[in-house]
Amino acid sequence: MPWIQLKIDTDNQHADALSDLLMEEGSLSITLEDGKDTPIYEPTLGETPLWNHTVLTALFEADRDLAIVVEQLKLQPYLGEDFSYKIEQVEDKDWEREWMDNFHPIKFGERLWICPSWREIPDPDAVNIILDPGLAFGTGTHPTTALCLEWLDSLDFADKEVIDFGCGSGILAVAALKLGATKVTGIDIDYQAIDASKANAERNGVEDQLALFLPEDQPKDLQADILVANILAGPLRELAPLIAEKVKTGGQLALSGLLKEQAEEVAEFYTQWFDMDEPAHKEDWSRLTGIRK
């Protein structure tokens, strides 16, 4: 079944009202995109910001007369007679298959591969993690996750215990276990992340070595030889003392989820406990590493 879509240039003040109106006019879905590709890296807690220049795309069934919809839109005072819009035909596709075709095995470092379950493993002798893309948590495609995976691939995990602080999908925890860690503790504030980590550990056969906790449930004396935290700059600053006390003397630390321009400032929060290395960068993002004093 073919579709037709209406694209409208609007702003962050009127996007919600416009979305409601288009749904009333029979739109099947609404998508909001940044008209100028302006990134939002770290919104305020509870905030879901929109862009000043927002492109709204409304999808309709092909037999809907969009000329009628456009006439209704012209009556809205915040749009007026001369608002910018575009009508496009949408090819009918197997969207699930097309989505799956976009994901391929990815190699990190020398040993580590992340592979979707529907793809053939490129190197059976490598360290392979089976992980399917999800909506909320990391799958290795984001630069910060890639930076952490590359760092983990470089380590010797013999007789080492690890903390994955902000475990999300569990991708870093599972990677550490597949690379040889004896035990990993994953901590996250989101119970859905705990469930996702557990499921991914089970899929990769390492669930018996992974302990998962919400912050309030974690052991009070928890420490590890290696700690990786891929969260955001704000929490990394605020939680520096807590993170530091979880790393044993001589232990290794990796922090990511921060932008290049944030790296130096965040590193300063850790220098009293760690000998910090020079940051590593990928695209606009950075990773900090250090050794516990």
From Swiss-Prot:
What domain of life does the native source organism fall in? Bacteria
Q: Which GO terms describe its molecular function?
A: protein-lysine N-methyltransferase activity
UniProt keyword Thylakoid present: no
**Which GO cellular component terms, listed alphabetically, does the Swiss-Prot or TrEMBL entry include?**
cytosol
Q: Which residues bind S-adenosyl-L-methionine?
A: T145, G166, D188, N230
User: Where, subcellularly, is it found?
Assistant: Cytoplasm
What biological-process GO terms show up in the record? methylation
The keyword Methyltransferase is assigned to this record: yes
What does the record give as EC number?
2.1.1.-
The entry assigns this protein to a family as follows:
Belongs to the methyltransferase superfamily. PrmA family.
Name of this protein: Ribosomal protein L11 methyltransferase
- Organism, scientific name: Shewanella sediminis (strain HAW-EB3)
